[in-house]
A protein has these predicted regions:
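Acidic, S/T/G-rich, low-cysteine, solvent-exposed domains in lumenal/extracellular/periplasmic regions
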Residues: 291, 312-316, 327-329, 351, ...
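Extended, domain-scale alpha-helical bundle/helix-rich regions
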Residues: 1-72, 76-81
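Structural motif
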Residues: 104-106, 344
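Short, mixed charged/polar active-site loops
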Residues: 151-156, 328-330, 345
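Conserved functional hotspot residues or short segments at active or partner-binding sites
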Residues: 9-18, 340-502
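Short acidic, Pro/Gly- and aromatic-enriched capping/linker segments at domain boundaries
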Residues: 325-337
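Cleft-lining beta-strand/loop regions that shape enzyme active-site pockets
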Residues: 28-32, 54-70, 79, 85-90, ...
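Amphipathic, well-packed alpha-helical segments that form the structural scaffold of globular domains
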Residues: 17-21, 40-44, 48, 108-111, ...
Length: 503
């Protein structure tokens, strides 16, 4: 691959040597904590697919992901050779506010307040991060080698740690307005939810109010790639779109079943709603999508979801009065299975959208069903709930319009071609080592990409290019799946179905 990327033999040799050297170094830097976690998880996964042990550092990272916050300087770090490099800074964080730290700067030393500097060249990234993070209000000093110049000038930057909110991982909304077509100029709201973190429902409620103030005609909730998170937040999120009622059923052991309900009697948004999912939408995402589908409250579009229908509990191994200097980490273990309010389980089967998109991901090849020791699918009794207006008749109309539209859409034509090519190649168990053959394959792929790019440019009324390197830097990446979700939502609005009207 390096030779195909126009590297000389000497350059390829040097680069591979560096890669292998770094890999060996990382292996040698492994600690007993890493080995213990690996051994414990090898045992835990023989019990059940989602039972695991988290080392102290990974347990801390789990809490950070759930709370979308941490205490530190607000910088994203990455290891490059023996250096810890600043890749980006969090807007509004101490690193950003200082004005003294920029992307590509290298951290070569770390000191706590007035203590001596510790040289961190060659250290593991997580160990450097451990030194830099600390309680809000405390001081950390960094020796920084500027990355933007050839001269190796080192400066000392003193920063006061603060609580950092990971805004880039929080729910966001935008107004989607088609520029062409029968609905040109008509606004839809799109709420993108990356995960079910703590207080997600509060964030989404704010985004809904913002979209309503902009008079959107409908809302799309984008759950693509959302692997789940808090079960409580899945219930609260569902409650934003229904007045009250059961959201998910949970069975502990062999018999006890509890029902998580929305009880506030309030609705944040009562208009047309579409939920966009893919094969990587899992767990809490499936709870929300399934509830919306069972209530006939929203139209579900996209790919069949992952199929994770189990509930895990996260518990620290330390006790409140423990006197250990070092934390012990935590365990996650499966305590229950959750079920749709119609009684079915999402385990293995996931949520099957009302309108399925073409997909290269085969459910039999990726998902919960591929996990070793995954619990089986089963079902329980239906919960007591009332559906919204029956949308079956409207669904036939929407599906017909969708199928007709994607047959005429160049982007979906490309997607179908890619799926066909993937299926033809996925079972090949050989690859040519003949340079001329590989170069021919590369040229063919580049020509196909260039032809597609020029077709898109023409469609957008822009000038074509002669090479892929000449593509405009500000050219927006197309999202045909979201575009089609918008088209389906407009179709749904025209039918007058899937709004909140009781039978």
């Amino acid at each position: 691959n390096l030779i195909l990327a126009d590297k000389t033999w000497e350059e390829a040799k040097e680069l591979l040597t560096k890669r292998y050297t770094r890999a060996i170094k990382r292996t040698k830097q492994a600690k007993s904590e890493d080995v213990f976690q690996t051994a414990m998880n090898a045992f835990a996964r023989t019990i059940e697919a989602h039972t695991s042990y988290l080392s102290p550092r990974n347990a801390e990272r789990f809490q950070m992901d759930m709370n979308l916050s941490f205490e530190g300087i607000g910088a994203v770090l990455q290891s490059e050779d023996d250096y810890t490099v600043i890749k980006s800074v969090v807007p509004g964080g101490p690193a950003d506010e200082s004005g003294a730290i920029k992307p590509e700067d290298k951290i070569v030393g770390v000191a706590q307040d007035d203590e001596e500097f510790v040289d961190v060249i060659g250290w593991r990234l997580d160990e450097v991060v451990e030194l830099i993070k600390g309680p809000k209000g405390s001081t950390v000093r960094l020796q920084v080698e500027k990355g933007a110049t050839d001269a190796k000038t080192t400066s000392v930057v003193s920063l006061t740690r603060d609580k950092i909110k990971l805004e880039d991982r929080a729910a966001k909304s935008e107004v989607y307005v088609p520029e062409t077509g029968p609905h040109a100029g008509e606004p839809l709201g799109v709420i993108t939810i990356p995960s079910f973190y703590n207080n997600l429902s509060m964030d989404v409620a704010k985004e809904i109010e913002s979209l309503k103030a902009q008079n959107v005609k409908g809302v799309i909730v984008d759950l693509r790639g959302n692997g789940g998170g808090s079960l409580t937040e899945a219930t609260l999120l569902t409650g934003l779109f229904i007045e009250k009622g059961p959201v998910v059923q949970i069975r502990y052991g062999q018999s006890k079943v509890s029902v998580n309900r929305d009880t506030d009697g309030e609705v944040a948004y009562d208009g047309p709603l579409t939920v966009l999912v893919d094969r990587y939408s899992a767990s809490a995402s499936e709870i929300f999508a399934a509830a919306m589908q069972d209530y006939n409250r929203a139209l579900i579009v996209g790919e069949q979801t992952f199929g994770k229908g189990t509930v895990q509990q996260h518990r620290g191994l330390g006790k409140i009065y423990d006197l250990y200097d070092n934390p012990l980490g935590s365990v996650q273990f499966t305590i229950a299975k959750f079920y749709r309010i119609d009684g079915g389980s999402t385990q293995h089967k996931g949520v099957i959208p009302d309108i399925l998109y073409p997909s290269a991901v085969e459910p039999a090849e990726w998902g919960e069903s591929q996990a070793e020791n995954a619990l089986p699918w089963d079902s329980i009794n239906r919960a007591n709930y009332t559906t919204f207006a029956d949308g079956t008749a409207a669904l036939d109309v929407l599906t017909a319009k969708h199928n007709k539209r994607i047959l005429q859409d160049p982007e979906f034509s490309y997607i179908q071609d890619d799926i066909k090519e993937y299926k033809e190649n996925k079972d090949k168990n050989f690859i040519s080592l003949v340079k001329s053959v590989r170069e021919g394959e590369k040229k063919e792929a580049e020509e196909k990409s260039l032809a597609r790019a020029n077709e898109r440019l023409q469609r957008l009324g822009m000038e074509t290019v002669t090479t892929l390197d000449d593509l405009p830097e500000d050219m927006e990446e197309l999202d045909p799946f979201l575009d089609e979700a918008a088209n389906i939502t407009f179709d749904m609005i025209e039918t007058g179905r899937y709004a909140i009207t009781r039978n």
